[in-house]
């Protein structure tokens, strides 16, 4: 039902519906995750792990909340500048698009998170930390 409301809100031009107990950024992440078929608790955990939800985070060519690389965003249709990846809505949209691609490719959390992290050899610490963070969001979204 909530997924239907998110899709309907998107079609009507609304960015997202606020979710009680979540910040605006977190609500947007849940909204995009549901639209793109990614488990929302995993998307929230990735954003927390990558930037602690900080829209202005920049590190080694990674930008914004989801720490998206410009070249990666371009592969998913982004035509803007690196600075534009710092816009929370833009960053979340493309970050979750990458995560959705990884889920379609690997279909389960461990491999999908390794894919998102850009690993040729999977970073088990990153995966473990994201999965641990995801547990609290899974409980909050029930």
Regions found by a protein language model. Name each.
Residues 3-23:
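Bacterial Sec-dependent signal peptides at the C-terminal "C-region" and cleavage site
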Residues 16-142:
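Catalytic glycan-binding domains that act on GlcNAc-containing polysaccharides
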């Amino acid at each position: 039902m909530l997924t239907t409301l998110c899709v309907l809100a998107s079609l009507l031009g609304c960015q997202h519906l606020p979710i009680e107990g979540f910040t605006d950024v977190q609500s947007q992440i849940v909204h995009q995750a549901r639209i793109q078929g990614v488990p929302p608790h995993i998307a929230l955990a990735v954003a927390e792990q990558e930037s602690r939800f900080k829209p202005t985070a920049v590190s080694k060519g990674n930008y914004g909340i989801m720490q998206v690389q410009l070249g990666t965003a371009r592969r998913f249709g982004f035509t803007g500048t690196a600075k534009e990846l710092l816009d929370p809505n833009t960053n979340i949209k493309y970050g979750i698009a990458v995560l959705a691609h990884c889920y379609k490719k690997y279909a389960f959390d461990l491999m999908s998170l390794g894919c998102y992290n850009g690993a040729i050899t999977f970073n088990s610490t990153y995966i473990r930390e994201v999965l641990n963070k995801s547990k609290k969001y899974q409980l909050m979204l029930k």
